[in-house]
């Protein structure tokens, strides 16, 4: 049986730090970011279905979010100001991402590729799926800013402002619900979020 390097590559996502040009109180890697995005995307999909008449597969959304940055194991995490410096760079980077996504799919044993390709290749996402994952991705970046600012790191002030504009552009009913119900707790200390539920 032929060996595959697919999961050995994915395990290296934990070695790629996000926010590489920013001073961080706590470094965040792509692996842990992907898990948080998967949890938030799943929540957004569940909220959409339960509260706002949606009909999306919340489990699939979680899987798409889990793999949404997988290609960065081959490309690295390009800082946002560089990635979107101009439309030409953004377009070229998208092409590089597409090549990296295909390279990852090609690492998967052939008999499993039809399972993993639709998770890794973002061109297989529906518009609704893509929107939910992008909302979750932006929300998690925003939450990172809140955590850094709460720790006294003003380096993230401008990033927070930019992400607020991104969130406004991607705004949805499910995002509004998430922002109202879950986000305020990120401004609180461990003692404050623990006082209502002692062990």
From Swiss-Prot:
Its main location: cytoplasm. SUPFAM superfamilies: HD-domain/PDEase-like (SSF109604). One of its GO terms (cellular component) is cytoplasm. The record marks 18 as: Appears to be important in orienting the phosphate for catalysis. Residues 30-142 form the HD domain. Pfam families: YfbR-like. Substrate binds at residues 18-19, 33, 69, 77-80, 137. It is found in: Cytoplasm. The keyword Cytoplasm applies. A divalent metal cation binds at residues 33, 68-69, 137. Its EC number is 3.1.3.89. Keywords: Cytoplasm, Hydrolase, Metal-binding, Nucleotide-binding. Catalyzes the strictly specific dephosphorylation of 2'-deoxyribonucleoside 5'-monophosphates. Belongs to the 5DNU family. This is 5'-deoxynucleotidase YfbR. It comes from Escherichia coli O1:K1 / APEC. The gene is yfbR.
């Amino acid at each position: 049986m032929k060996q595959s390097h697919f999961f050995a590559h994915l395990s290296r996502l934990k070695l790629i730090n996000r926010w590489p040009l920013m001073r961080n109180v706590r470094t965040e890697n792509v692996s842990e970011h992907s898990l948080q995005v998967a949890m938030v995307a799943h929540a957004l999909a569940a909220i959409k279905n339960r509260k706002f008449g949606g009909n999306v597969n919340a489990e699939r959304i979680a899987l798409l979010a889990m793999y949404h940055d997988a290609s960065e194991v081959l490309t690295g995490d390009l800082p946002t100001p560089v990635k979107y410096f101009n439309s030409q760079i953004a377009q070229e980077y998208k092409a590089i991402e597409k090549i990296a996504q295909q390279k990852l799919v090609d690492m998967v044993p052939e008999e499993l590729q039809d399972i993993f390709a639709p998770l890794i290749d973002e061109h297989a996402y529906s518009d609704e799926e893509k929107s939910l994952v992008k909302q979750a991705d932006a929300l998690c970046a925003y939450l990172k800013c809140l955590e850094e600012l709460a720790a006294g790191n003003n380096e993230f002030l401008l990033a927070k402002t930019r992400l607020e504009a991104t969130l406004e552009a991607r705004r949805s009913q499910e995002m509004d619900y998430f922002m109202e119900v879950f986000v305020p707790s990120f401004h609180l200390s461990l003692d404050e979020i623990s006082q209502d539920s002692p062990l």
